[in-house]
Curated annotation (Swiss-Prot):
Name of the protein described by the UniProt record: BTB/POZ domain-containing protein KCTD6
GO cellular component: cytosol; M band
Keywords for this protein: Cytoplasm, Growth regulation, Tumor suppressor, Ubl conjugation pathway
Residue stretches making up the BTB domain: 12-81
Alphabetical list of Pfam families matching this protein: BTB_2
Originating species: Homo sapiens (Human)
Biological process, per Gene Ontology: negative regulation of smoothened signaling pathway; protein homooligomerization; protein ubiquitination; ubiquitin-dependent protein catabolic process
Oligomeric form and interacting partners: Homopentamer. Interacts with KCTD11; KCTD6 and KCTD11 may associate in pentameric assemblies. Interacts (via BTB domain) with CUL3; initially a 4:4 stoichiometry has been reported, however, electron microscopy revealed pentameric states with a five-pointed pinwheel shape. The interaction with CUL3 is indicative for a participation in a BCR (BTB-CUL3-RBX1) E3 ubiquitin-protein ligase complex. Interacts with HDAC1; probably indirect as the interaction is requires the presence of KCTD11. Interacts with USP21 (preferentially catalytic inactive form).
């Protein structure tokens, strides 16, 4: 880290580009474990690289970093029940040299009480942008809610009737809304209300991430994802 960066407060936001995935956190979080590689990087003892946008760049597994960052925030390891990439996550923990995380991954005891399970809601906003307009023009935006909590999807269908004309796709575990270039403010309003509704149902935001794609010569696609989780108790059938 450059000496000039020390003017930042430890709670100021820092954006990391991990394998093409952007994460925003604080210096306090990144240096929670001073003996780790991240603690050395952001404590000034280890060289850092930046991408063309000025974000700190780490050439590692982008999707798995969400679990590393969440551990830094809470000092707890919380994984989805169907998580299968333990070996890959151990390699990431070894790379970042976070000893408490390594111990958690090597500990055979269950991550959750045996009578509970984790419910997950994924909210994504996929926005297609024109490359050649100035200012940048939004071509289309799609909001998608994906979850196995059917009561939540039913609530969204019942309480968000104001946006019914934009509801383009409903499936067993998914509801989607599509907005055209003139509906930007409506999409933002719905997104804010959806986040409020999801959190009021007892979910807490676990992770946010941004992914940039270029699918066509004249379009860029930007995808924002928010993951919400809550613990629920198992019921006897």
């Amino acid at each position: 880290m450059d000496n000039g960066d020390w003017g930042y407060m430890m709670t100021d936001p820092v954006t990391l580009n991990v394998g093409g995935h952007l994460y925003t956190t604080s210096l306090t979080t990144l240096t929670r474990y001073p003996d780790s590689m991240l603690g050395a990087m952001f404590g000034g003892d280890f060289p850092t690289a930046r991408d063309p946008q000025g974000n700190y760049f780490i050439d590692r597994d982008g999707p798995l970093f969400r679990y590393v960052l969440n551990f830094l925030r809470t000092s707890e390891l919380t994984l989805p029940l169907d998580f299968k990439e333990f070996d890959l996550l151990r390699k990431e923990a070894d790379f970042y040299q976070i000893e408490p995380l390594i111990q958690c991954l090597n500990d055979p005891k269950p991550l959750y009480p045996m009578d509970t399970f984790e419910e997950v809601v994924e909210l994504s906003s996929t926005r297609k942008l024109s490359k050649y307009s100035n200012p940048v023009a939004v071509i289309i935006t799609q909001l998608t809610i994906t979850t196995k909590v059917h009561s939540l999807l039913e609530g969204i269908s019942n309480y968000f009737t104001k946006w019914n004309k934009h509801m383009m796709d409903t499936r067993d575990c998914q509801v989607s809304f599509t907005f055209g270039p003139c509906d930007y403010h409506q999409e933002v309003s719905l997104r804010v209300h959806l986040m409020e509704y999801i959190t009021k149902q007892g979910f807490t935001i676990r992770n946010t991430r941004v992914h940039h794609m270029s699918e066509r010569a004249n379009e860029n696609t930007v995808e924002h994802n928010w993951t919400f989780c809550r613990l629920a108790r198992k019921t006897d059938d």
